[in-house]
UniProtKB/Swiss-Prot annotation:
Annotated pathway: One-carbon metabolism; tetrahydrofolate interconversion; Amino-acid biosynthesis; glycine biosynthesis; glycine from L-serine: step 1/1
Sites of N6-(pyridoxal phosphate)lysine modification: 230
Gene field: glyA
Family that this chain belongs to: Belongs to the SHMT family.
InterPro entries membership: PyrdxlP-dep_Trfase, PyrdxlP-dep_Trfase_major, PyrdxlP-dep_Trfase_small, Ser_HO-MeTrfase, Ser_HO-MeTrfase-like, Ser_HO-MeTrfase_PLP_BS, SHMT-like_dom
Keyword Amino-acid biosynthesis: yes
CC per GO annotation: cytosol
Highest taxon of the lineage: Bacteria
GO MF annotation: an example: glycine hydroxymethyltransferase activity
Keywords: Amino-acid biosynthesis, Cytoplasm, One-carbon metabolism, Pyridoxal phosphate, Transferase
GO biological process, one term: glycine biosynthetic process from serine
UniProt-recorded name of the protein: Serine hydroxymethyltransferase
Record's subcellular location: Cytoplasm
C-alpha cells in the first residue's frame, strides 16, 4: 500500500533538484518561445491525477478494458468541449501530440506514395508538412511551397500553380513561424481545383481561434489538427477536429487507434477537458486579445530599433526577427539572450544563408509572457532589453545588467503567485 505522504523530495534528490531548478527557471526567465506557455494549477492537477493508472484502449463506450466508466466521463467532456470551442462536428482528443494528430490525419486521407503539399520547414512550416526527414516526406511524395522572399507572405498564386502542376491528394495549410492571417478559403479553393483534401494545422493558432479572434478553418477544411498547449494553454498533447463526414471520421478514429497509438493517456485527456473549459471563460478571450496586442507591440518596438521583422509585423502571437542585415546568427542571439534570462529560439528565415542548426533569425512569441500578466508597458521595456543585448551581443556587462532587470520584472509578475 502506498502512503499519501510519499514525496519525490525525500526519495530522489537528483530528480527533485532538477524539478526545483526548472521551476525556478520558469519563474526567473522571460519565456518568448512561441510554442510554450504556462498551464493552470487545475491542468497540473488533472495531469497528475489517478487517471494515469487507467488503461483505456478504444473509445468511450467501446473500450477493450473494463473499469472505464469514469475515464469515459473525462474523455466525453473533452470531446464535447472541443466541439463547442471550435464549432466542430467531430473531435478526437486521444492523439499524444500534434505530430501524432498529423500522422493519423495523413494516414486517414492518403495512401503511401500519394502526393501532399505543405509549407517548407525553412519558410515556417512544420516537420509533418512534408519535410524529407519526417514520415510525411518519406511515406508520401511531398511538394513544398514557400513564402515570398520580399514580403514574407504566402504566395497563393504559387501555391495554386504548384497544385495544378503536381495534383496533390492533400494540401496542408499550417505553420510554425508565419505571423499573418491565413486565407483558409483560398486554400479551400485551390484544393477543390485539383480535387485535393485540405488539412488545416492550427497548432499555433488554436487559442485565438477558440476565442473567436482569428478565422476558424474547421468548417472549411476537411480535417483540422492542433496541439493543445501553445496558445490554447493546455497540456502538451494533440487534437483532431473535423466537419461532418462519417467516412472521414471513421478513418480518423481507426488511424489514431489502433493505427498509430494504443491506450490513450487518460490523465492528459482529463487535463485537456479542464483546459477546454478554461478556454470557454470570458477571461480567455481577453487573454487572447492581449496576446496579439503584446506581439504587435513587441514587433513594432524591435522594428523601431532597426531590426527586420519578416512580413513587416504580425497579426497573431508570434513574429520572426531576420538578423541577416545585422550580421548575427540566430544561434548566437539565442545564446546571448539566454544568458540574460530571456528565452527565445533560433529560427530559419526565408532564404536563410545559414544551416538550420545556426539560422539567421529568432522567433518571438507572446503567449507565455501574457499569461504572466505582461501588457504593452512591460512589452516595450522588454523589447528594448532584447535590442540592447542584440546590439552588443558580446558585451557581458550589458547582458548582466539586462538579467538583473529581467529578474526584477519576473518578481513583479510571478507565474504561480
Amino acid at each position: 500500500m502506498y502512503s499519501k505522504e510519499m514525496r519525490i523530495a525525500s526519495y530522489d534528490e537528483e530528480l527533485e533538484t532538477a524539478l526545483t531548478n526548472e521551476a525556478r527557471r520558469q519563474e526567473e526567465h522571460i519565456e518568448l518561445i512561441a510554442s510554450e506557455n504556462y498551464v493552470s494549477p487545475r491542468v497540473l492537477e488533472a495531469q497528475g491525477s489517478v487517471l494515469t493508472n487507467k488503461y483505456a484502449e478504444g473509445y468511450p463506450g467501446k473500450r477493450y478494458y473494463g473499469g472505464c466508466e469514469y475515464v469515459d466521463v473525462a474523455e466525453r467532456l473533452a470531446i464535447e468541449r472541443a466541439k463547442i470551442l471550435f464549432e466542430a462536428d467531430y473531435a478526437n482528443v486521444q492523439p499524444h501530440s500534434g505530430s501524432q494528430a498529423n500522422a493519423a490525419a495523413c494516414l486517414a486521407l492518403l495512401a503511401p506514395g500519394d502526393t501532399l503539399m505543405g509549407l517548407s520547414l525553412a519558410h515556417g512550416g512544420h516537420l509533418t508538412h512534408g519535410a524529407k526527414v519526417n514520415f510525411s516526406g518519406q511515406i508520401f511524395n511531398a511538394v513544398q511551397f514557400g513564402v515570398n522572399a520580399d514580403t514574407g507572405l504566402i504566395d497563393y498564386d504559387e501555391v495554386e500553380q504548384l497544385a495544378k502542376a503536381h495534383r496533390p491528394k492533400l494540401i496542408i495549410a499550417g505553420f510554425t513561424a508565419y505571423s499573418r492571417i491565413v486565407d483558409w478559403q483560398r486554400f479551400r479553393a485551390i484544393a477543390d481545383g485539383v480535387g485535393a483534401y485540405l488539412l488545416a494545422d492550427i497548432a499555433h493558432l488554436a487559442g485565438m481561434i477558440a476565442a473567436g479572434i482569428y478565422p476558424n478553418p474547421v468548417q472549411i477544411a476537411d480535417v483540422t489538427t492542433s496541439t493543445t498547449h501553445k496558445t490554447l494553454r493546455g497540456p502538451r498533447s494533440g487534437l483532431i477536429l473535423a466537419k461532418a463526414n462519417p467516412e472521414i471520421e471513421k478513418k480518423l478514429n481507426s488511424k489514431v487507434f489502433p493505427g498509430i497509438q494504443g491506450g490513450p493517456l487518460m490523465h492528459v485527456v482529463a487535463a485537456k477537458a479542464v483546459a477546454f473549459k478554461e478556454a470557454m471563460e470570458p477571461a480567455f478571450k481577453d487573454y487572447q486579445r492581449q496576446v496579439i496586442r503584446n506581439a504587435q507591440a513587441m514587433a513594432e518596438a524591435i522594428q523601431s530599433r532597426g531590426y527586420k521583422i519578416v512580413s513587416g509585423g504580425t497579426d497573431s502571437h508570434l513574429f520572426l526577427v531576420d538578423l541577416v542585415a545585422k550580421g548575427l546568427t540566430g544561434k548566437a542571439a539565442d545564446a546571448a539572450l539566454g544568458r540574460a534570462n530571456i528565452t527565445v529560439n533560433k529560427n530559419t528565415v526565408p532564404n536563410d544563408p545559414q544551416s538550420p542548426f545556426v539560422t539567421s533569425g529568432i522567433r518571438i512569441g507572446s503567449p507565455a509572457m501574457t499569461t504572466r500578466g505582461f501588457k504593452e508597458a512591460e512589452i516595450c521595456e522588454l523589447a528594448g532589453w532584447v535590442c540592447d543585448v542584440l546590439d552588443d551581443i558580446e558585451n557581458e556587462t550589458v547582458i548582466a545588467d539586462t538579467k538583473e532587470k529581467v529578474l526584477a520584472l519576473c518578481a513583479r509578475f510571478p507565474v504561480y503567485g
